[in-house]
Amino acid sequence: MKIIDKLTEEVLNNKYYNDLYKKCSLLSADINLKIKSSKYNLTSKELNDSLRFADILSNSTNSVARNNSYQIVTYLNSHYSENEIYKTVATAVYSKLGNFPAINYLNTYNNNDAILPINREIEVEAKKLIQKVPDTENIFFTDSQFELYSKLINTLEYSFSGPTSMGKSFIIKAFIKKVMKNNPPENLVILVPTRALINQFTIDLKEEIRQLSKVYKYRILTNSNISDFSENELHNYILILTPERLISYLSQESNPPIGFIFVDEAHKLTNEKDSRSVTTYTAIEKTIKKYGNIKLYFASPNVSNPEIFLKLFNRNNVNSSFQTNESPVSQNLFFIDLLNNKIELIQGKNNTTIESDALFKKVNNTTDLIQHLGKGKNNLIYCNSKSRTIEEANNFSKTVVNSKMSTELKKAIKQIENYIHPQYYLANLLKNRVAYHYGKLPQLVRNLVEDLYKNEDIQNVFCTSTLLEGVNMPTQNIFILNNKNGLKKLQSIDFWNLSGRAGRLSRELFGNIFCIQHDNCTWDNKDILNKSEISLTPTVLTKIDRNIRKIEKLLKNQEISGTQEEKYILKYIANIISVDTLELQSNYRSPVIDKLIEKNKNEIIELAKQKVKDYSIPSYILNSNQSITLSTQNDVYLELKKNNKKGENIKLPNSSKIDYCVCLEVLEYMYKIYNWKNGEKKLQNIGSLKYYALLMNQWVNGLSLSQIIKQSLDYHENNMIDIQVDYNDFVPFKRGNQKHINIVIEDIIENIEYVLRFLFEKYFNHHYQIVASIVGEDSAGENWASLLEYGTQNRIAIALQNIGLSRHTALGIYENCKQSLTIENGKLKKVNKEMILARFKVGSLEFDEINRIL
């Protein structure tokens, strides 16, 4: 054992050290809770000893010791930042940890100009030289970031995990820049769980690689339609895709090969209660099958066994995973019980009750608490559902007085009123520097909220589990108002992923997490607060292990018990097993088939073979559409093939003929042929098709969101339509009621995002694939799935969206700036950014987005 390791062990087990560590943490807690007390002030000896312990621990390789070292110095910062000994030791500790953002904080906010001994200075300069981020000026990796980056660039497959605040996206972007310089160049896919993340990652990456992409001829795309561009010179691609879009990319034989796939938020593969975890598995498995030697990488937060993701896909090389608990920012976790007037500082097994009578004299409810503890700070407030998020934001906003608005904030309010509606809640909330944020919020509005928050133009953002999807909104404080995600209990992986947003690198040394027990949320079990190792198992493996009998029943076409979502996931997995048996003839065994063979479940494999052996539908269509019932797919194929033989037209109408009547006719046709009455819960009511046809017609014909909303509000008013204001409460719509207006707006946004752009798109894409397989792609007509995805029939507007622009801006460019676009053979070849910007008003939504994306 090295001397430093022995010394570290002695320190961590030393009672005096542990007493000091606790006192330092309570001193910091009093400040964060605004409890004015001198109870935990340190004597001179205690201060010096605490700093000496921190200095010793910073030399360790033990991540617990290094974290403790960081935390001691951070705990003491608010009280002792002007103390000369503190200044020197703080600089020395952060330097030893390679935490350059923390050193920058000391210089910027503490005016810390401490000079280290010459040997320490040399060590710091050497570390800077080695850990400088490529293609940047004065930006350096922390020690743990550099260790990971060094391993990443020297492997062909890797899986890594660390705290949310570690800066995994930062490392991924540095890795991408390195890959772009490879010779020969290769195409990359960044796989993200949601469309919201596509936009965020695209914006961040474009800012990072703007110059490199010109030099190395890389183009960033956000969808699978590469053919929408006219190419005179060869380009390479960085594709930022959801699992669904990757599956679509794989189904297009003309698309170029992929050399790298980087799976961000890989823990989503283990979410047993979300069918998209199975879609993610399918997308990755199909990619590996198609491009056998593809380089494969996984990134996940707070997972103790990151190697599990490589093992899932039979990639199990030694030394191909990395896990660390070392974080460049610290988090203070408090449990505040408003029912019993109690506060606990949570520190693993050493939780401490904090005397807090003075606090509870000022605070009676969650709003009081957020205003008191969050005053003058950036606060994210987590709620468990969209409706609760909007409700809490509105209630909180009513208590805010005399909120001064910045120029940027005033501009954003005007933009949202024009883009959505003047009575939209969010526009009113922003006047009090309050906002809400959820996954299906329109892309442009999400961007506005995130930018306003990042730049501190707004202070309090109420949000849903969108933060759990990886949306990058670091904050000073997080208030957790509910311990559920929807109706389900928050899982440990989700809780710590959410909590990890507290603390903004370079802006502060720590963040605060306040878990609140109140009238609407009781924490019967607080185990989730005590951080422990989080070991995960992918959904497909878990379901096969625990539900093999149910899967067997499904393969026999028998009914099974369980919730709708559970049954859907098991049907999905049964489909995957069945389709995968078709590959056995070519000696390819998928991970799922391998798992069944390993468990001696050959009878399941045989059942699956029997299920599909007489199917006529081409296997590549089944492969691309495993979430649609296999028998339905085959029935549709046989029906269309029979109709084609009779000489009937099996194509959908040409896009130039689309109106309300055509949309309704097509939806009724799809309802019948795909058996939505029995196979798709959301679409089983045939009466709802009239509404969806109306919305679909407006959407694919390019109406703006504000126009769609206005027409819908007119329709509701003129026809006295009943709207749902509560769980079982329906009332006639009233135009003068702001709540009614917002219910209609939220319904429209939800139906565009989920029904049109997800459900309908899935079925229309499947229909197009079948038609193309029967009559050939050149004769297959329009793929309505593209019209639904992009909300336009215009190929140029589609191409503009594919490079990262929103539908709104893409349509605006096409309508107002055609002369700025070089179009060749009906395809987009080149965009003149300067000419386009000249046509839009400075400060408009469109101007800001064009400036950022193009």
Predicted features and spans:
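N-terminal helicase ATP-binding lobe
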Residues: 1-854
